Amino acid sequence: MGDEGKKEKRRQTKEDAVYGFVFESDSNSDDSGGSRRKKRRKTKPVKFSSAGNIDQVLKQNRGNCKIDENDDTILPIALGKKIADKAHVREKNNKKENFEKFSGGIGMKLLEKMGYKGRGLGKNQQGIVAPIEVQLRPKNMGMGYNDFKEKNAPLFPCLNKVEEKKKSVVVTVSENHGDGRRDLWKKKNVRKEVYITAEEFLGKKQEEGFGCDQLIIDKRGPQDRVVNSLRNLYAEEKATDANVQQPELQHNLRFIVKSLEHGILKTDKDLRNEKGLALSLQQEKEKFKMGVKKQKTLFDNLGYVAEEIDRIEVEIASGNLTLDSLANRFKDLRSSYPDDYKCCNLSCIASSLALPLFIRMFQGWDPLSDAEHGIEAISSWKMLLEVEDNQSISTPYSQLVSEVILPAVRVSGINTWEPRDPEPMLRLLETWEKMLPSLIFETILTTVVLPKLSIAIESWEPRLETVPIHFWVHPWLPVLGQKLESAYQIIRMKFGNLLDAWHPSDVSVHTILSPWKTVFDAASWEQLMRRYIVPKLQVALQEFQINPADQNLDEFNLVMGWVSSVPIHLMTDLMERFFFPKWLDVLYHWLCSEPKFDEIMKWFLGWKGTFPQELSANRRIEIQFKRGLDMAREAVERMEMSQPGARENISYHKAQEQRQSEGRAKVQAQVDDPEELSFKEAVELFAQEKELLLKPKPHRMHNGLQIYRFGNVSVLLDSANSKLLAQEEGRWFPVDLDSLLKMHYSAVTGKQ
């Protein structure tokens, strides 16, 4: 008994060393873990097991004891048995403490029996269900550290609805079903590591879009946070949970990951840039290849063109080449090598080669007598030499025309052309207008036609010449246009000299003046009529006598002949002031003598018919005729007639007599005392008397005074000092009017 009563120390077998307490519990399932091993009963027979049975048992034990690589709930040593038993005891105690939580305690049952449904207190159930929920902060954690959440799980989840409570109980029981010892040592929320390659990462970024990250500022916490996308908005919150240990280490890991991501993105960006650079270099290489090929083709073409030009020069030197054949040779070159023709400016070479042939063709040409000479040759070369889309002034064709055509036209226009015979020059310009460049055409007008025409206008004498000036000036209006404005001033001055001594009986003046109504501007024409024509017509109407018995209408018809030329308001004013007062007065006296009304009506209608339509349709003229008709009606009805204009004419005649007397006095004063005229007016009057022109020179000043042209002499009018200065040999000296006139005649004689 002594030896058998002792506790025999159990030896560790090979299976215990391999399988631990699991194998022990299986082999000693009949005994308790700490009990003494029973004695062997030697009376029973020995049992033998075959090798196959032993292997089967070992395999079964190994299969039952297989541990998952990711399962950390069971310790691989025998010590874990005691630890697991203690953990199982703690779990039972926790279940007892939370019994009311999962089974619905007596307090909740009593409240339910009294009608409480788990909602807020109050009539409208507006009270809070749970009291203020608090949560203990971890040790040494300040306010706002790692976005710590102040509010976590509800303090009393048992206050939920009964249905939710029952459901939660079922779920809780089902979740806690099984062996608690194994669940206690299992890691919860195991994070599986996910590995991605650089290609997968770049593919993911490509789906999101490179460079499309938005800068998002999160202001929900005590401190602002900057995130790149909404995907990462809650990433840091999860990473900085209060239950997570070592946030600095996790921050460093995230920093390393982000650095790797940035490195991958930078490498990918550099790779894409290098690929783009390689592609652009390849394209540039192809471009250079095409340029080299094009230059080689151009070089070959230029060699052929140079050889062709050398052959053309040899043929020209031998005299075997004409203008037509030369033009055909260059047309072939332009059609065969259009790019080379334009690039090398072969039109200039063609123009230089054709110039001697054109000079030979137009040698001795008279443009005024034979305007169409050589126009066909010029037309063919115009198409060959003109460069398309060339806005420059100097072109090969314009240079050719300026050296061949322009000199001949200039010589013929200056030496041969007579301005009073405009047809030859007009025919020449009309024939060559389409062939001449616009610049050369304007040069001919400004340097040949206009100066020659201006000299002819200045030398025109309207009293001596029988051909009106508009015969040889008006044909140039469509061609010269506004360039004749300076000549119009000279023509108006010539008209003024002519009209000073004009009488209305001279109908030739109307023939000379009327064509210029549409040429001069309205203000200049009205001024000319008011100054020279209207006063003479006024005198004619004043001298006109109205006699029903023996009426002479010659003077009246002379006045009516100017209706189309004189502005209508001036002519109406003349008739109201100087014709109708006489006419109404004669009608009044005739009606007072008991006449025959048939004769009066015939006389009335006859006078009305003598007025031109444009004048009789005027409202003011109609009023005057209506006054005469009213007088006749009063006489027929035996009504008392008032003398026409009795009251108005008294003041009118007085005012008229006063104006006439003042006018005569003014004229007499000017004759008696010429100093009443301004200094400039006196010089102008002297120039008009001598039929000379006094006009300012545009943009010519000397010591602040305008320089005028008196005939052929340059003068200065110093009105402040009443001095007249003339220029001779570059010097200015004072002169009188007679000396100035002698200087003009001397200049004319010197030119002749």
Curated annotation (Swiss-Prot):
InterPro entries: G_patch_dom, GCFC_dom, STIP/TFIP11_N, TFP11/STIP/Ntr1. Pfam families: G-patch, GCFC, TIP_N. The keyword Transferase does not apply. Residues 103-148 form the G-patch domain. A motif (Nuclear localization signal) lies at residues 36-48. Identified in the spliceosome C complex. It is found in: Nucleus. This is Septin and tuftelin-interacting protein 1 homolog 2. Disruption phenotype: No visible phenotype under normal growth conditions. Belongs to the TFP11/STIP family. GO terms for cellular component: spliceosomal complex. It comes from the Eukaryota. Residues 35-45 have a biased composition (Basic residues). Residues 1-17 have a biased composition (Basic and acidic residues). The gene is STIPL2. Residues 1-52 are annotated as: Disordered. GO terms for biological process: protein phosphorylation; regulation of auxin biosynthetic process; spliceosomal complex disassembly. Keywords: DNA-binding, mRNA processing, mRNA splicing, Nucleus, Spliceosome. GO terms for molecular function: DNA binding; protein serine/threonine kinase activity. The keyword Nucleotide-binding does not apply. The lineage of its organism: Eukaryota, Viridiplantae, Streptophyta, Embryophyta, Tracheophyta. Involved in pre-mRNA splicing, specifically in spliceosome disassembly during late-stage splicing events.
